Amino acid sequence: MATVDECRDALNRLAARMDANAASSGNQIDLDRPLACTVTDLGVAFHGQLTGGRLLGLTDGDNPDAKIRLTASSDDLVAMINGELDLAKSWASGRIGIKANPFDLLKLRKLM
């Protein structure tokens, strides 16, 4: 089981990668939504804001008003962010949960 710090570090790496991709591509994704990530086996959550292809303001705690919600175990979250776990297959099998409206899901797919 990954630790809370490992999950936080993985999410920060994801935010840095998204920031670099948004800066280098010049192709802004029109998505401005609050995002929350719940780590089921640790009982913790993180939240931030997806804006222009970037994940900003990542902090500890849940955001009950999040329009995009990711749910995963600590190991699955770290593996997904490290590229060791296929997001689409994990979501289809129910290993990782993503709650968002269908249009946001299509935009998220471009970011991942």
Please give the residue ranges for each predicted region.
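Feature captures hydrophobic
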Residues: M1-M112
